[in-house]
């Protein structure tokens, strides 16, 4: 599957599902290789993105196992793959214990979900699915059963750790939220506000601690060092340097998520495409 080196990450929430096709056309025209659709979508929700484009890869970023039936997922996946071959990446995640009362042992639950996908009448191809894997054992499962991992809210150091754990030949595709604004105080305020919900989730804070940040860094809204690393701010050229840091750390593909622009983020996507793709 040709994800390309640079993609975008966004849910439909900022502009509404009815405009997904319009947004997808812009993403493809700008030269991005993939759109990772956030907001815990079902596979069927990606049809407008695929139908509006001819080469763009659509990816679930991510499908939540607690909210998804594996047999329905496999059937929807097979239907879209038949209609749009080579253009669908099934990103699967376990979510967070803070977000669901049904949260059980995450590794066991993910393994069971993959088993059900494989046993379905229309099994999903292992090389066209990936896991949102932060912890070492989940990364091991991603290596054994999927194409690799889609990381979220991580530093380049975590990308390096993931690459080391997965080894060569496996997908490492981190998301990178960013703020295109050269006013440092204003941009950092946007980045810090965005980061708050993630700093309240144990899976993310443990991953940040494992990649070299301290308890002080993750406390009280996040240190400037943490915020500036995980949610960089500045010009498109400055953001491109952070993208390159992930690529240098072993990422195959980085999906950028510009913050702070209402509706379809045309200006941000255009500026990032010029800086990252040319």
Which stretches of residues belong to each language-model region?
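Active-site-adjacent structural elements that line small-molecule/cofactor binding pockets in enzymes
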Residues: 1-278
């Amino acid at each position: 599957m040709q994800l390309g080196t640079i993609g975008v990450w966004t849910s439909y929430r900022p502009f509404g599902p009815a405009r997904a096709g319009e947004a997808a056309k812009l993403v493809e025209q700008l030269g991005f290789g993939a759109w990772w659709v956030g907001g815990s979508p079902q596979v069927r929700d990606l049809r407008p993105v695929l139908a509006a484009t001819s080469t763009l890869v659509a990816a679930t970023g991510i499908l939540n196992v607690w909210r998804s039936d594996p047999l329905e997922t496999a059937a929807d996946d097979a239907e879209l793959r038949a209609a749009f071959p080579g253009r669908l990446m099934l990103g699967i995640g376990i979510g967070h214990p803070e977000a669901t009362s049904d949260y059980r042992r995450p590794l066991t639950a993910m393994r069971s979900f993959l088993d059900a996908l494989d046993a379905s009448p229309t099994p999903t191809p292992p090389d066209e699915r990936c896991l949102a894997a932060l912890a070492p054992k989940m990364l091991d499962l991603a290596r054994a059963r999927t194409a690799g991992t889609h990381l979220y809210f991580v530093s380049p150091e975590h990308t390096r750790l993931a690459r080391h754990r997965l080894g060569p030949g496996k997908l490492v595709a981190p998301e990178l939220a960013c703020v295109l604004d050269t006013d440092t105080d204003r941009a950092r305020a946007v980045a810090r506000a965005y980061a708050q919900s993630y700093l309240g989730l144990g899976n993310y804070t443990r991953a940040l601690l494992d990649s070299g940040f301290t308890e002080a860094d993750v406390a009280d809204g996040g240190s400037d060092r943490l915020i500036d690393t995980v949610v960089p701010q500045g010009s498109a050229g400055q953001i491109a340097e952070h993208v390159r840091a992930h690529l240098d750390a072993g990422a195959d593909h980085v999906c950028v998520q510009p913050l702070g622009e209402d509706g379809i983020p045309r200006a941000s996507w255009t500026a990032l495409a010029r800086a990252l793709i040319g």
